[in-house]
């Protein structure tokens, strides 16, 4: 697949971007290089390669998802600057 200057200018027009001819030619050349690299990668035989979720062999150790109703609310409210009826009060910042 080849990206032409016309393709770039059409996309720029649809996107309401102002591009001159020289910039469009530069973009088309760069995109052609990128697509050429993708063609090279597409030709690599990956039949015996397992898909990876992570490039590192590390595994995340996750804790059990167990509901815990004790969040220590009384302890938090004891050190909060302002509390009223179990709610945290904060100063008004927008008038």
UniProtKB/Swiss-Prot annotation:
EC top class named in words:
ligase
Function, as annotated, reads: Allows the formation of correctly charged Asn-tRNA(Asn) or Gln-tRNA(Gln) through the transamidation of misacylated Asp-tRNA(Asn) or Glu-tRNA(Gln) in organisms which lack either or both of asparaginyl-tRNA or glutaminyl-tRNA synthetases. The reaction takes place in the presence of glutamine and ATP through an activated phospho-Asp-tRNA(Asn) or phospho-Glu-tRNA(Gln).
Q: This protein's superkingdom?
A: Bacteria
Organism ancestry: Bacteria, Pseudomonadati, Pseudomonadota, Gammaproteobacteria, Moraxellales
Family to which this protein belongs: Belongs to the GatC family.
Q: Which reaction does it catalyse?
A: L-glutamyl-tRNA(Gln) + L-glutamine + ATP + H2O = L-glutaminyl-tRNA(Gln) + L-glutamate + ADP + phosphate + H(+); L-aspartyl-tRNA(Asn) + L-glutamine + ATP + H2O = L-asparaginyl-tRNA(Asn) + L-glutamate + ADP + phosphate + 2 H(+)
Q: Report the protein name in the record.
A: Glutamyl-tRNA(Gln) amidotransferase subunit C
Q: Which organism is it from?
A: Moraxella catarrhalis
- GO MF term set: asparaginyl-tRNA synthase (glutamine-hydrolyzing) activity; ATP binding; glutaminyl-tRNA synthase (glutamine-hydrolyzing) activity
**InterPro entries in UniProt:** Asp/Glu-ADT_sf_sub_c (IPR036113), GatC (IPR003837)
The alphabetized UniProt keywords are: ATP-binding, Ligase, Nucleotide-binding, Protein biosynthesis
The reply on keyword Ligase is: yes
Subunit comment for this entry?
A: Heterotrimer of A, B and C subunits.
The EC number on file is 6.3.5.-
GO biological process assignments: regulation of translational fidelity; translation
């Amino acid at each position: 697949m080849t990206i032409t200057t016309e393709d770039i200018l059409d996309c720029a027009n649809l996107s309401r971007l102002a591009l001159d001819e020289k910039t469009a030619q530069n973009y088309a050349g760069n995109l052609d290089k990128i697509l050429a690299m993708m063609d090279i990668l597409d030709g690599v035989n990956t039949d015996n390669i397992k898909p990876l979720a992570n490039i590192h062999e590390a595994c995340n150790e996750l804790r059990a998802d167990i509901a815990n109703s004790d969040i220590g609310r009384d302890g938090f409210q004891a050190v909060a600057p302002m509390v009223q009826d179990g709610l945290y009060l904060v100063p008004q910042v927008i008038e």
